[in-house]
């Protein structure tokens, strides 16, 4: 007995601890908190922050473009070269020079030598000829060496046709475009979060409505059992309530599955698994604070999509300038200084102008101009589409506001009708079908009210996102004259 009591005590403690843990792990969250968490922690946000920083660094990396470039070079090489040096001309010149020198000297000694001068001259010239003839007509020279030559070189563009400034401009435009892309992604995340958060609230309301209907049908069924036992109604009438109760139970099961699925999607979006309670309810603003004409006129100044497409047009225009610059000559200065013991150096100015490369640069310019034109047209088309979305979303939001007022009146009428049908049935003046229809009508109106509020929330979100001001969505939750669906 003591062992069983101890085991029971431990089991109770374990159950209590698990219940306490589940309560502690459960988390309630408002829409404001959910948006803050999503924009801070989501993988998409982190990825676009990294891409934005990368674009900014690339733009900063090109700030020094156009400054002199200094390189340290080391060349290590060995060479072997064989040359055939012709010596024929050298031999002829040497023989002629020696012969002329000997002849002039003998002529100076003509008086002393007398008749022996000419034979002596011929003999010496023959000796010179024979001696020079020993020299080959050509000689092979072999050159070999191993060299390590360190140098410092410098190049500086003097004129590039505008390519330097265009490259800097394009890099800055890409950095700005990356910022707009990050902002656009944040707006998209807000829209996705609104959809997931308030869909979970919608499913919660549908679950509550189905639970209300199930409880009511269960109560009607129990009352019908009592009335059948007392003989006031037939078995067929009682079975009508039983079928209605079963249908209500099936609808409740479906609603419960939908609510759990929506909660899972929201937790997955927020990278959590503990969110079970949402504190920001569905809502409908009674008054429309936005003017349609102002929205249609001002959206190009706020829409990240339009601004990004305009940035694409500016990038296309920079490409046109770059293609034109590629047709122009370039001018540059250069220099090199040898760091070995010889200390050789060279400085100069060079020019380059491409005469033929196989690429039709004029067609490249035409292609770039067409791309710019296409970008302008696509921007205008995007404006038309956004105008249509703004108009449709504005109309849907206004219709949802009007429907909400009608639904509130219908709810009161449906509640009164159910009360009357229940009294009529008890007095045997009404049928079971009338009570069931009245109950279903009331439950349906509750569900329709929640659906209409969700429609308003999503229409408002689509309107603000198209306009480029979805970050203001939170301000509409706490506006005066707002009805909440709880």
Predicted stretch roles:
Residues 2-4, 29, 57-59, 180-302, ...:
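Periplasmic alpha-helical coiled-coil/stalk elements that build and connect Gram-negative outer-membrane
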Residues 7, 71, 76-99, 450-486:
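Acidic, low-complexity, intrinsically disordered peripheral segments
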Residues 35-41, 91-135, 272-331, 473-486:
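Amphipathic alpha-helical coiled-coil scaffold segments and their short linker/junction regions
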Residues 36-46, 53-68, 114-119, 141-144, ...:
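A glycine-/polar-enriched beta->alpha junction
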Residues 47-62, 185, 189-210, 219, ...:
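Amphipathic alpha-helical coiled-coil segments
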Residues 51, 312, 336-346:
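Solvent-exposed loop/turn segments connecting transmembrane beta-strands
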Residues 72, 328-339:
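Transmembrane beta-strand segments that form the barrel wall of outer-membrane beta-barrel proteins
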Residues 76-80, 158, 337-341, 353-355, ...:
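Transmembrane beta-strands of outer-membrane beta-barrel pores
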């Amino acid at each position: 007995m003591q062992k069983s009591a101890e085991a029971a005590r431990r089991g109770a403690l374990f159950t209590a601890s698990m219940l306490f843990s589940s309560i502690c792990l459960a988390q309630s969250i408002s829409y404001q908190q959910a948006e803050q968490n999503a924009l801070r922690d989501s993988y998409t946000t982190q990825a676009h922050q990294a891409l934005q920083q990368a674009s900014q660094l690339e733009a900063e990396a090109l700030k020094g473009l156009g400054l002199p470039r200094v390189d340290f070079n080391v060349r290590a090489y060995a060479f072997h070269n064989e040359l055939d040096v012709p010596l024929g001309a050298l031999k002829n010149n040497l023989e002629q020079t020696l012969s002329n020198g000997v002849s002039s000297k003998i002529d100076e000694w003509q008086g002393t030598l007398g008749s022996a001068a000419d034979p002596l001259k011929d003999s010496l010239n023959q000796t010179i000829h024979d001696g020079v003839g020993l020299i080959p007509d050509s000689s092979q020279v072999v050159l070999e060496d191993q060299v390590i030559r360190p140098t410092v070189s410098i190049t500086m563009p003097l004129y590039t046709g505008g390519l330097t400034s265009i490259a800097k401009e394009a890099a800055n435009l890409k950095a700005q475009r990356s910022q707009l892309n990050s902002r656009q992604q944040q707006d998209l995340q807000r829209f996705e979060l609104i959809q997931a958060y308030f869909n979970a609230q919608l499913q919660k309301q549908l679950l509550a409505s189905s639970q209300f209907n199930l409880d009511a049908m269960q109560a009607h069924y129990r009352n019908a059992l009592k009335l059948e036992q007392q003989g006031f109604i037939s078995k067929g009438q009682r079975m009508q309530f039983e079928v209605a109760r079963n249908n209500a139970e099936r609808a409740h099961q479906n609603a419960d599955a939908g609510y759990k699925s929506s909660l899972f999607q929201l937790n997955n979006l927020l990278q959590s698994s503990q969110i079970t309670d949402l504190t920001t309810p569905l809502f409908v603003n009674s008054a429309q604070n936005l003017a349609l004409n102002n929205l249609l006129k001002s959206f190009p100044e706020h829409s990240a999509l339009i601004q990004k497409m305009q940035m694409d047009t500016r990038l296309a225009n920079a490409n046109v300038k770059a293609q034109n610059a590629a047709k122009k000559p370039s001018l540059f200065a250069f220099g090199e200084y040898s760091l070995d013991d010889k200390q050789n150096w060279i400085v100069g100015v060079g020019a380059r102008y491409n005469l033929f490369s196989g690429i039709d640069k004029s067609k490249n310019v035409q292609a770039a101009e067409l791309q710019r034109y296409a970008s302008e047209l696509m921007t205008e088309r995007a404006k038309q589409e956004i105008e249509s979305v703004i108009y449709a979303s504005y109309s849907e939001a206004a219709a949802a506001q009007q429907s909400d007022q009608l639904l509130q009146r219908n709810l009161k009428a449906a509640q009164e009708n159910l009360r009357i049908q229940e009294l009529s049935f008890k007095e045997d003046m009404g049928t079971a079908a009338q009570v069931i229809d009245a109950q279903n009508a009331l439950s349906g109106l509750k569900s329709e009210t929640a659906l209409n509020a969700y429609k308003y929330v999503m229409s408002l979100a689509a309107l603000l996102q198209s306009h480029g001001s979805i970050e203001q969505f939170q301000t509409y939750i706490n506006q005066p004259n707002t009805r909440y669906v709880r």
